[in-house]
Every structure is written in structure tokens, then in C-alpha cells.
């Protein structure tokens, strides 16, 4: 028998009875105990126990029903709030510029000299754990510049850039493939790129997703896809340093490779905005402005805050053919060479970088 001011029939049915093989009775008043004991000692025992267990099962089912309903109500409420906080763009007022080509092209032999001015040395210093302006930072900068001087005519970078008609849904970007599409020959009609949405509103009250920045179906909007990596000769030189047991020199070259790829990403994105896609032909920005993303559009990279799922790399491989520039993917979607980057180009003027 269970009784007391802090007990209840529901608590007994849900929390106590399932833990005990025998019957567990809840009594509101101790005066009921003798009456219940008489029933259990007499010929009404089986009937009393059967009624008890039936009633407790009904209580458990009713609680489960209410719990499920409350959960559904919460989900619906969150979905309603999320939909209310989704960014809404008046697409009729937007100018959707067509890229200069559709499909995929390779940009070979991007020179180190071309991208060198775009290196963000702050990130280089962060990698080495030195502060800007310190003697340590100045010393490693001199060594890095000397290495760049030595390799600038020996190695290069390569890129793949594709442009595709696309449209946004509530949770993805859908890429359309034309007949003769270089990635599939038009056999595969669409590629769906999932774009996760923020679960909490930002400062402006929106829960952002990259799909918000791509026009709905039927408006002839486009996105770009890109990948950039160092040349095979760069990778071979780096591996040779590792085999020779030169940890400092190999780390210096690896860190420069990472910075060169990011610099090439900045340089190529500028070319895309001004000429290759051409949606911002009159852009005039300084390098420091580029670091602060003051340009129109964005280039979210796979595996980074707004596209965190590394397996999206396999979709990118389908779109632009990473092997064409000697990028290989691991089973988890990581790229080799390590000094590589891959992502999307989105041109909308309201697009911004954000974290999921």
C-alpha cells in the first residue's frame, strides 16, 4: 500500500507499480487500509487486483498521450516561431545577374604572385601563436616571405568553378542540371544541398539559412561552387621536407600553403564578383575591406559555421569534379591535400556570414 500527502494514484501507477511484480495500491486515507485488506484476503482479491492494474494502465496511457501532445505542441510552436523569424526577401525587387557561363571550368596555374597580396597574415600569426608586432612575429614573417620568394616560380594553385541555375526551399538549395551538364551529362536532374537553419534568432530577429539567399523556384537564380588547392609540385615538396625530418621547415611550408589557398580564395572571389559572374563589376575595395567581407555576396566554405556538415563535400564533388584538380576525399569528406578549400558562391546583396 502507498499513501501519504506527497503521493498520488498517478505517481504510483507511473513510477512505483512498474518496478514491482505484485499489486501496488494507492490509498488516499489510512482508514481505507482495513477495507482494502479485507477485499484482498477474500474472494474479491483477483477482481480487485485486475481492476487496479487496468486502472493504472489507463493512467499511464493517458499520461503518455498528454506528454506526446505537449511535445507536438512545442514542436508546432517552435516551427511557427521559426517560420515567423525566417528572412523574407522581396525577390521581385532583386536584380538576378546571370553568370558569364554555366557549367564547370578549371582555372590552372594561378600564380603565387597573383594571390600573395591577399594573404591574411593575422591568421598566419595566430597559427604560430605569436602576436602582431612582436619580435617573434617579425622573425617568422621574414622567414615566410623568404620561402615565398623561393617557391613563387616553382609552384602554383588550381581551382574549379561552376555556375548552376538553382532555387531555395525552406531547408535546402536545389541545383538544376542542364542537358550536357559536365558533372553528369544531364542524367541527374537536380542536386539538393541541405542548408541548416539557426535555431535561435540573430540580433535582427531572424533564424538564418543559406537557402534564404537563393530565389524561389522559377526565378532563374544561380549559385556558384568552387574548390581551390595547391599544385602537385607543392605537395611533393612538402612531403619531401617531412621525409627529411625537417619539422620546422615542413610546418612553415604547410602553414604557408594554407594561407595561400585562403588568399587564392579571396582573390578568386573578387574575380567572380567583378567579371566571372559579374554581379559587382564596379566594386572598388581595399584588401583590408575584403578581410572584413564588405563585398556583395558570400562564399561559405564546407565544414565552416553556416555549412558545418563535412559530408556536403560529396555533393560538391558531384557538382564540380574535385579530382580534376587532384583533390581527394576521405570517407568522412576531408580533403587531401590539406591546403584546399571548397564552398559556394552566393550573390544576393543581403547575404551575410553567420554561425549555425
Predicted segments, located by residue:
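Activity-critical C-terminal alpha-helical subdomain
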Residues: 241-245, 266, 279-356
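Structural recognition of alpha->loop->beta junctions
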Residues: 16-34
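Short, ordered loop/turn segments at secondary-structure junctions
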Residues: 1-7, 28-31
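Active-site loops and adjacent core secondary-structure elements that bind or stabilize anionic groups
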Residues: 31-251, 255, 276, 326-338, ...
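Glycine-rich, charge-decorated loop segments at or immediately adjacent to ligand/cofactor-binding or catalytic sites
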Residues: 5-20
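Charged, low-complexity helical/coil segments in non-catalytic cytosolic or luminal regions
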Residues: 261-275
Amino acid at each position: 500500500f502507498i499513501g501519504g500527502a506527497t503521493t498520488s494514484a498517478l505517481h504510483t501507477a507511473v513510477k512505483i507499480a512498474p518496478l514491482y511484480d505484485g499489486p501496488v495500491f494507492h490509498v488516499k486515507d489510512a482508514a481505507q487500509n482495513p477495507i482494502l485488506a479485507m477485499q484482498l484476503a477474500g474472494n474479491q482479491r483477483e477482481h480487485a487486483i485486475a481492476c487496479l492494474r487496468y486502472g493504472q494502465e489507463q493512467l499511464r496511457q493517458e499520461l503518455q498521450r498528454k506528454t506526446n501532445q505537449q511535445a507536438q505542441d512545442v514542436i508546432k510552436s517552435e516551427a511557427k516561431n521559426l517560420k515567423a523569424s525566417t528572412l523574407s526577401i522581396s525577390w521581385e525587387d532583386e536584380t538576378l545577374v546571370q553568370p558569364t557561363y554555366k557549367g564547370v571550368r578549371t582555372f590552372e596555374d594561378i600564380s603565387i604572385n597573383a594571390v600573395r597580396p591577399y594573404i591574411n597574415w593575422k591568421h598566419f600569426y595566430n597559427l604560430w601563436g605569436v602576436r602582431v608586432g612582436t619580435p617573434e612575429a617579425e622573425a617568422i614573417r621574414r622567414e615566410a616571405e623568404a620561402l615565398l620568394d623561393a617557391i613563387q616560380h616553382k609552384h602554383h594553385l588550381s581551382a574549379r568553378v561552376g555556375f548552376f541555375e538553382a532555387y531555395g526551399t525552406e531547408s535546402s538549395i536545389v541545383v538544376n542540371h542542364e542537358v550536357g551538364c559536365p558533372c553528369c551529362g544531364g542524367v541527374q536532374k537536380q542536386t539538393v544541398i541541405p542548408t541548416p537553419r539557426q535555431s535561435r534568432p540573430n540580433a535582427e530577429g531572424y533564424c538564418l539559412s543559406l537557402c534564404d539567399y537563393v530565389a524561389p523556384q522559377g526565378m532563374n537564380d544561380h549559385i556558384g561552387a568552387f574548390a581551390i588547392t595547391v599544385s602537385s609540385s607543392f605537395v611533393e615538396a612538402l612531403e619531401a621536407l617531412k621525409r627529411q625530418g625537417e619539422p620546422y621547415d615542413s610546418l612553415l611550408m604547410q602553414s604557408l600553403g594554407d594561407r595561400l589557398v585562403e588568399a587564392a580564395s579571396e582573390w578568386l572571389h573578387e574575380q567572380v564578383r567583378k567579371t566571372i559572374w559579374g554581379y559587382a563589376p564596379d566594386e572598388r575595395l581595399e584588401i583590408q575591406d575584403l578581410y572584413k567581407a564588405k563585398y556583395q555576396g558570400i562564399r561559405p566554405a564546407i565544414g565552416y559555421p553556416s555549412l558545418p556538415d563535412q559530408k556536403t563535400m560529396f555533393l560538391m564533388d558531384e557538382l564540380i569534379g574535385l579530382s580534376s584538380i587532384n583533390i581527394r576525399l576521405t570517407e568522412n569528406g576531408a580533403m587531401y591535400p590539406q591546403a584546399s578549400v571548397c564552398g559556394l558562391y552566393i550573390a544576393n546583396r543581403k547575404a551575410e556570414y553567420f554561425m549555425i
